[in-house]
Amino acid sequence: MRNRYIESFEKAQIADKNIPQFKAGDTLRVGVKIQEGDKTRVQNFEGICISVRGTGTGKTFTIRKMGANNVGVERIFPLYSDSLESVTLLRVGRVRRAKLYYLRDRSGKSARIKELRK
């Protein structure tokens, strides 16, 4: 049993953020605040969500994109972090797995995910 004060604090933290519902296979654009000296800017990271794990304020998600020279880049973001400026859902993917780690071994056409038709 968790402390009720901690639970109420976490619910307040979650209610403040405006984050869309997404799952593994969806294409997301994440705006991350970056502090360089005394300046703050927002850097976008766009890719496929390959996993969502955890619950409550400890929830994290992993985004994978193909960088320069076809090098895969993965970043793990805490969902309710203050450094996240925005999370935008670009495409809803059609997948049958909760964790898409098999995409690490694929490249080219086999690494693509079909879009969910409505």
Curated annotation (Swiss-Prot):
Q: Which keywords, in A-to-Z order, does the entry hold?
A: Ribonucleoprotein, Ribosomal protein
Q: Does the keyword tRNA-binding apply?
A: no
Looking up Pfam families in the UniProt record yields: Ribosomal_L19 (PF01245)
- Give the record's GO CC terms: cytosolic large ribosomal subunit
Single annotated GO MF: structural constituent of ribosome
Q: Which InterPro entries match?
A: Ribosomal_bL19, Ribosomal_bL19_CS, Ribosomal_bL19_sf, Translation_prot_SH3-like_sf
Answer yes or no on keyword Ribonucleoprotein: yes
**What's any GO biological process attached to this entry?**
translation
Matching HAMAP family, A to Z?
Answer: Ribosomal_bL19
Family, per entry = Belongs to the bacterial ribosomal protein bL19 family.
Function, in words: This protein is located at the 30S-50S ribosomal subunit interface and may play a role in the structure and function of the aminoacyl-tRNA binding site.
This chain belongs to which protein, by name?
Large ribosomal subunit protein bL19
